Amino acid sequence: MEEALKLNFTIFGLDEKGTMTVLMIILDMLIVAFIVWLGSIGKKRRPAGPQNLVEWTVMYICNYADSIIGEKDAPRYYALLVMLFLYIFVGNLIGLIPGLVSPTASLSVTVTLAVGVWLYTWFEGLKRKGVVKFFAHYAGPKSVPIAIRIPLFFIELLSDFSRMISLSFRLFGNIVAKEVLLSVLVTLILGFWPIVAKSVINGMIFSIAAVLRPLIIWLGVLVSLIQAGVFTLLTATYIAGAAVSHEEHSSEDEMHHINV
């Protein structure tokens, strides 16, 4: 990763890397708060520029939540999904700024996000379905023989636990890879700059690295957007599976088609 700013202090008894991560988390939250404030201005006057982008992002996430969770239940999760997307996306982008690191490039941050999502889906599922009905859905339909439902229950439960691992490591791995690639290009540019004029080969390497860096930055923005979107959309899918009964969702879809 690109060399981070050197800190002359630490907080909470953490080392320098941990302190930087905490500072980046705080910076991330402040930027997200500003974006939310910016989006709220559009309610008071005609939105333009960045406000349109914020509004479009919110509408896209809400529409996707409607299609996955259902129009009846989705609104209760709008705020969670939008804030989750903004926090991860902004956190991913922070690492593109020289001297700063993405908070999502820390495994402790991505694991915390994944565990938080998993606990929330369980909380919602238990609250809305009840203990018996919630755990029963892991065993499959009642029409399935009991000899199959018992092992299926444990397989599905293990699969549910594995979501935390896949969510956290997918985000962590992609963001770290992005920052490592940028770090390599920066090293090439800064390392070969003093001797560019002395060697044709070094000059070629420097030129290639200098051209690739803007492209890699744009690629980093794209990766940041995709990873934030994937994390958020998977969260919506997990909520739909845990907290919304298939019968309610199916009947809602039928009513929607009838109304159409």
Can you name each region flagged by the protein language model?
Residues 1-260:
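Selective transmembrane helix interface/packing segments
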